[in-house]
UniProtKB/Swiss-Prot annotation:
One of its GO terms (molecular function) is proton-transporting ATP synthase activity, rotational mechanism. It comes from Dictyostelium discoideum. This is ATP synthase F(1) complex subunit epsilon, mitochondrial. The gene is atp5f1e. It comes from the Eukaryota. It is found in: Mitochondrion; Mitochondrion inner membrane. Belongs to the eukaryotic ATPase epsilon family. It holds the Pfam family ATP-synt_Eps.
Length: 74
């Protein structure tokens, strides 16, 4: 089973699924690859509240997270 390999590699299932999805998108021909690249990005906002008021906002962007992961690997 493939589950044994991602566990043996020391990665989570979500990391494994992300790697597989990236490889599949890279195999697509150009007009379809560009459309798939546009769909894979995301932006998420997280708002922290203290005493019923907004204290801080964190914006999670897929591009920023990818850069952070590359920095952690090196």
């Amino acid at each position: 089973m493939a589950g044994q390999y991602w566990r043996a590699a020391g990665i989570t299932y979500l990391q494994y699924a992300n790697i597989c999805g990236t490889h599949v998108r890279n195999c697509l021909k150009e007009p379809f690859r560009a459309a798939a690249k546009n769909r894979e990005g995301f932006i998420s906002n997280t708002v922290m509240y203290q005493n019923g008021k907004e204290s801080s906002t964190i914006i999670l962007n897929s591009e920023l997270l990818q850069k952070e992961l590359l920095v952690k690997k090196n």
